[in-house]
Swiss-Prot record:
GO terms for biological process: carbohydrate metabolic process; glycerol-3-phosphate biosynthetic process; glycerol-3-phosphate catabolic process; glycerophospholipid biosynthetic process. Catalyzes the reduction of the glycolytic intermediate dihydroxyacetone phosphate (DHAP) to sn-glycerol 3-phosphate (G3P), the key precursor for phospholipid synthesis. It catalyses: sn-glycerol 3-phosphate + NAD(+) = dihydroxyacetone phosphate + NADH + H(+); sn-glycerol 3-phosphate + NADP(+) = dihydroxyacetone phosphate + NADPH + H(+). Its main location: cytoplasm. It is an enzyme of class 1 (oxidoreductase). Keywords: Cytoplasm, Lipid biosynthesis, Lipid metabolism, NAD, NADP, Nucleotide-binding, Oxidoreductase, Phospholipid biosynthesis, Phospholipid metabolism. Sn-glycerol 3-phosphate binds at residues 108, 137, 139, 193, 246, 256-258. Signal peptide: none annotated. The lineage of its organism: Bacteria, Pseudomonadati, Pseudomonadota, Gammaproteobacteria, Alteromonadales. This is Glycerol-3-phosphate dehydrogenase [NAD(P)+]. Pathway: Membrane lipid metabolism; glycerophospholipid metabolism. Its EC number is 1.1.1.94. It is found in: Cytoplasm. SUPFAM superfamilies: 6-phosphogluconate dehydrogenase C-terminal domain-like, NAD(P)-binding Rossmann-fold domains.
Amino acid sequence: MQTPQVTVLGAGSYGTALAICFARKGIPTTLWGRDADKVAVMQTAHENEEYLPACPFPESLKVTADLGEALKDVKNVVVVVPSHSFSSMLKQAKPLLAEHARVAWATKGLEPDSGRLLYEVAEETLGDEHPLAVLSGPTFAIEMAKGLPTAISMSSTDQAFVEELSGLLHCDRSFRVYTNNDFIGVQLGGVVKNVIAIGAGMADGIGFGANARTALITRGLAELTRLGLKLGAKSETFTGMAGLGDLILTCTDNQSRNRRFGMALGQGKGVEEALKSIGQSVEGYRNTREVVALAARNEVEMPICEQIYAVLYEGKEPQQAAIDLLSRERKTE
């Protein structure tokens, strides 16, 4: 049997979609899922009926719940688990990684409690033995799985890794991969946009309209850029796929869980009720707390993120948060 060239860890909607994209090109791909019962269903159905119904698996994609089997002799590993599971996933995988393995992730978030970027977590856990890379950009899983045109950014600490992995994923007809040497900026864009998307959803849930949504996206981009520059990112990253691209998609399309969560809040649901109504992980909920703490540590002003935090964690009404934002002192753009 041919050794898989790519293993994707995490069989949710996005992990499954990425695995399909690799396998669609004929690349031997393994998708690992934690839940053995759900994996057995996928093995029988040849699709992920729970998250991506009617998206059949290519012949070169296999699914397993055996982590050792999934990682054996694999060169390219892509982690796609929620940010709160990222550290534990790496610790579980580390002793099973091949000596030559390179590790990428498509997780968008910060480490809970510490607020560290995920590359810091990966470096601490894996050391310098394995090259690292991150995938980020404006993508919805269902559209990727269906082969609809998509573009993302990929950044790495190792140029050979990013060139090879981007080449495996890139497809002239449906999937364009842009490489980017801003390892910090590509990661940060995927985090902050989740928070701003909650705000955009709240504004629409309240009924504020397109003008307010556009203003919020624009000023949200300014907040992202301020924080990114303070952390050493490049400003041009935030006008690319991993910044503005992801921000626009997540703030304007109802496929976004973060946006739908915000809309539910704007329509009067409480935080817990709104979270339950989504039915899947809402990364922006945790991201909000972590981003606000990160900004405070670095003395970066992020008023939109701060007001969203007040709604999620301090019981402020969304309407009052909007009033407080609009009542801020006028200033030069």
